Amino acid sequence: MLVPKRVKHRREFRGKMRGYAKGGDTISFGEYGLQATTSHWITNRQIEAARIAMTRYMKRNGQVWIKIFPHKSYTAKAIGVRMGSGKGAPEGWVAPVKRGVVMFELGGVDEATAREALRLASHKLPVKTKFVKRGEA
């Protein structure tokens, strides 16, 4: 699973998810991509589940590029703990994805296979997505 090797601060502010992506909105490695049309936090477990869904469908043919990385930690307090007494312990890692970001890219397979593999991956993600080809995104 994807996690940072080391971070400067264990706990981060939540931040804002307004507007479109400033970068990462084009296909740069493969021929086909999965582009987010809404903004959301995507956990490292969701990224891994999407990767497994794609590679299993393609039967190890072609190549998958993951273009997002979960660099932001999120915290949670234990169940039954009252408010106050500081921020909770780090719970996991997320990748803040804005709309317009190409999250996954595929290459080395035909369009029908890529479309179906990315459709299966999109069911594992909490964002609405669309299939894009090189030159379109």
UniProtKB/Swiss-Prot annotation:
GO terms for cellular component: cytosolic large ribosomal subunit. The keyword Ribosomal protein applies. Pfam families: Ribosomal_L16. Transmembrane segments: none annotated. GO terms for biological process: translation. CDD domains: Ribosomal_L16_L10e (cd01433). It comes from the Bacteria. GO terms for molecular function: rRNA binding; structural constituent of ribosome; tRNA binding. InterPro entries: Ribosomal_uL16, Ribosomal_uL16_bact-type, Ribosomal_uL16_CS, Ribosomal_uL16_dom, Ribosomal_uL16_sf. The keyword Ribosomal protein applies. Part of the 50S ribosomal subunit. Belongs to the universal ribosomal protein uL16 family. Binds 23S rRNA and is also seen to make contacts with the A and possibly P site tRNAs. HAMAP family: Ribosomal_uL16 (MF_01342). This is Large ribosomal subunit protein uL16. It comes from Lactococcus lactis subsp. lactis (strain IL1403). The lineage of its organism: Bacteria, Bacillati, Bacillota, Bacilli, Lactobacillales.
